[in-house]
């Protein structure tokens, strides 16, 4: 039983577990006050033996969180006596993924389930966290999932918002974007999580397994595990000034090994050089965006190039033909200078 932001993720997880034979369900609370005991009891089948109530709050000094206490009260006035436990999710703005929800059901199925637990954070002080199986990922096989690593001010986030707009305006596909920033005003880490699908998207969380990963600042290869969330056989695009021979010298061995072990298709493009030569300065976004459309095949390549150039005309037409031409050249150069690297 839950309400609010986590219910779409819970529903998605319940449907996946049901496909695999698990007998689990969800009650979404849409109207909290006045709380309707009658409607709650009618919504829960008589055969239910165990219930986990998830609240997105921590009520200090209380015997439990608000929704949990209301559910307890509802059943105390009835002749039904299921085991009811409480949990918290989404605290500290932490993501709640399907793997977290599965851990709630796994805990509920135990002989002595943990009560007043927490999901989404690692609680090493009071040890209320549940064990999470990170290998549990939901993929319908039709959604293209993309992660873009960027640097604040390099245009990556703006380009990704534009990609969403291009696909939304020109196709029947559904598009979703989540953007994550660090605390710096500029030149800080940015991460863009994009999903594209022919079906409505109900994944209200960051991508845990991507089909495509792009990294704009080459320095990140030594700072982050860039392909940790890239699926087996996925595509990795690196914007770099290094030649193919120099890559082995600069990219850490663990990253190269991960690329090889997961059979990742590795591509590079010197977006910085292209942007400088066409007159765009440090703004590499158009080059990376073009490379994304070519490699991901979210759209047919010819259509993607046409839509990109149409969006350039629409966005920069008022600034003069020179600006439009620079961006169009960046698109053309990107399609010519993509390079596949064998690891």
Regions found by a protein language model. Give the residues of each.
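Short, surface-exposed amphipathic charged segments that create phosphate/polyanion-binding patches used
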Residues: 42-45, 96-106, 280-285
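Conserved thiamine diphosphate
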Residues: 73-92, 261-263
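Redox- and metal-dependent alpha/beta enzyme cores, enriched for Fe-S-associated oxidoreductases
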Residues: 1-22, 35-40
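Extended, charge-rich low-complexity interaction segments
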Residues: 53-72, 108-126, 208, 296
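Flexible inter-domain linker/hinge segments
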Residues: 92-145, 324-343
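Active-site cofactor/cluster-binding pocket
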Residues: 34-39, 47-50, 54-65, 142-152, ...
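Short beta->alpha junction loops
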Residues: 28-33, 86-90
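Short helix-loop-beta junction
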Residues: 12-26, 77, 166-172
